[in-house]
């Protein structure tokens, strides 16, 4: 596929006196999964609706694979797969009929629509429910059907709003594998999710949205590198007994090391300092059973940005 992606510059959108999107500037690369991260009410869904050509911005420009979705909505939709948070399917149609109908609306002939529906149902693990009405599907099953529906016309760009919502652990793993494969095929994928631990395992890049505006790369970088808490657990003793030897090995005050269940919590200013601490623990002969960041980098950055809001 050609090097297509998503570009938004100076995008704004208001609803009456409410500024849902104040100033959005973002790029999503082809062949990569980009995460759209922000709290409730930050404007993520409004932004996705504008990118999907379903809502016009008040100001700014949007390009989907080089196409302006405001001036050329049909051309943009031809290369765009949109998965909203809620399925919005025809409740009386079966899962198979939903995909066939959507394919036909995109101009596929009957044979291609039927074949594509069968393939996509298998890819999202719904073959056994192919002939079940959409209304009887669970929340997670509807999410999988929504993803399949977004893929019926082999789009180059995917916009996914909370695709992991309602999925069980195995289905989430399957979703990650599928998204990585789709990105490897050259697609541009922009995904919004509140499940930051899941998002971290699939994204290549992240865009942070706070109070309707994208956060500058400098501010994101500063947040990502601030002091971060790590979990430490020794294999041969309980946490209370581990505090003193860990503190001595790291040159810390034992009274300042908190305990969370089986782990000690220690803050380090970056990965290099954490790596040096691990080396010090091992050199001191301590049997380290766990040494890991307490939160993922996405969550750490998000929480730091949230804490820094005015």
PLM ranges: what are they?
Residues 60-68, 75-76:
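Conserved ABC transporter NBD signature motif
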Residues 176-268:
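ABC transporter nucleotide-binding domain
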Residues 52:
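Helix-to-loop junction immediately C-terminal to a conserved catalytic motif
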Residues 92, 133-137:
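Conserved ABC ATPase signature
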Residues 158-162:
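Catalytic Walker B motif of ABC-type/P-loop ATPase nucleotide-binding domains
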Residues 154:
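Conserved catalytic motifs of ABC-family nucleotide-binding domains
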Residues 100, 104, 111-129:
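Conserved ABC ATPase "signature" region
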